[in-house]
Amino acid sequence: MKKHGVLNSEIAAVLASLGHTDTVVIADCGLPIPDGVKRIDLAVEIGKPSFLEVLQVVADDMAIEKVTLAEEVIINNAEVNKEIERKLIEPAFEYVSHEQFKEHTKKAKAIIRTGEATPYANVILHAGVIF
């Protein structure tokens, strides 16, 4: 049994398989998940687990080069945006329209669905390298 890092076997396998620039999405419970993209559904009820809880665990276990967010989060969910910026200090940040964000999710290795039910609580994590 693992002692550290991500314990969820599906998430751990996805993170272990990532190459440089591959992407993983952490999403609220409302983001549409495109056909053909691996869905890892963690939602058990509204708000659980939260977007920020899942982001923290995944970010602690992943080399992240860049972060993509929907620009709408800045106004419509400023608190979550601030927390993302606080938790993820190193990577570059990119803001795109929500429609562009949804297009980008079609290329993700996986989308991790949380129980979060606040607007635009979604992030695309772009894998970096560990050296």
UniProtKB/Swiss-Prot annotation:
It catalyses: beta-D-ribopyranose = beta-D-ribofuranose. Its EC number is 5.4.99.62. This is D-ribose pyranase. The gene is rbsD. Pathway: Carbohydrate metabolism; D-ribose degradation; D-ribose 5-phosphate from beta-D-ribopyranose: step 1/2. Pfam families: RbsD_FucU. Belongs to the RbsD / FucU family. RbsD subfamily. One of its GO terms (cellular component) is cytosol.
